[in-house]
């Protein structure tokens, strides 16, 4: 498969006791399919790194534990300032990045596989400027800056593209406060971080699942509007006679 689509030269590199082959190849991309099953909403977060509109929760507890432990270790190593401490610091940082990337790869693969199985597109939040918008306690701010929302979103998008699954981005505004059952929006709908209870209709759900359902609903509405506009701009075939 590599020889059929290989482009340019390949490099064999020995690093950290392992051999790595770096090769560039062209991969034919399928055309995005029409999401006949609607959209699969995905809410990205900190406590739970990804939650879907189907109710699947990908907890970030282990990843966050690793990051908090490494943050304490980095602080001690930085205070030492020795050459050996700096070497260990680089090693710890590299190990953490690889662990986070592996976690994001596994989560993104699960999400894309489920969307493909159910013939749905994938709906994500437009996370531009999230670091400026989100108000969090200091420990969460540290986690937010150290964990890359963009990386998981990128992994989902490119895996979906390779599978021919359309991905759409929606405005994330008030998705955490809006009821996915009746549409009522209020800050009081969130009695705590993990729970959503609508003060209007009484609908109760895991807060992240509720947000993911709102994301999916916005994607369905946006897709319908954009494709209706596309259909309206298509030229009408000329009639004969």
Features from the language model and the residues they span:
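Substrate-contacting helices/loops that form the catalytic groove of nucleic-acid
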Residues: 7, 14-153, 224-241
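Beta-strand/loop nucleic-acid-binding surfaces
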Residues: 1
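Positively charged, low-complexity nucleic-acid-binding target-recognition regions
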Residues: 142-143, 147-241
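Short small/polar-residue motifs
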Residues: 4-11, 185-186
């Amino acid at each position: 498969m590599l020889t059929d689509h290989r482009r340019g030269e390949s490099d064999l590199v020995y690093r950290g006791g392992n051999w790595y082959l770096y090769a560039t190849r062209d991969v034919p991309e399928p055309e995005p399919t029409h999401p006949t099953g609607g959209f699969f909403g995905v809410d990205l977060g900190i406590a739970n790194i990804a939650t879907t509109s189907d109710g699947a929760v990908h907890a970030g507890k282990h990843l966050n534990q690793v990051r908090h432990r490494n943050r304490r270790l980095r602080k001690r190593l930085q205070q030492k300032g020795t050459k050996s401490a700096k070497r260990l610091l680089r090693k710890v940082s590299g190990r953490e990045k690889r662990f986070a990337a592996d976690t994001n790869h596994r989560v993104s693969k699960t999400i894309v596989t489920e969307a493909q199985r159910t013939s749905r597109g994938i709906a994500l939040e437009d996370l531009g400027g999230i670091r400026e918008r989100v108000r969090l306690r200091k420990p969460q701010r540290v986690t937010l800056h150290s964990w890359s929302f963009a990386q998981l979103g990128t992994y989902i998008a490119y895996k979906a593209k390779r599978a021919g699954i359309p991905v759409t981005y929606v405005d994330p505004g008030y998705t955490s406060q809006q009821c996915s059952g009746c549409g009522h929006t209020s800050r009081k709908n969130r009695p705590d971080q993990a729970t959503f209870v609508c003060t209007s209709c009484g609908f109760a759900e895991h807060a992240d699942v509720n947000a993911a359902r709102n994301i999916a609903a916005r994607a369905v509405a946006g897709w319908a509007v954009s494709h209706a506009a596309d259909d309206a701009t298509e030229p009408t075939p000329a009639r004969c006679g």
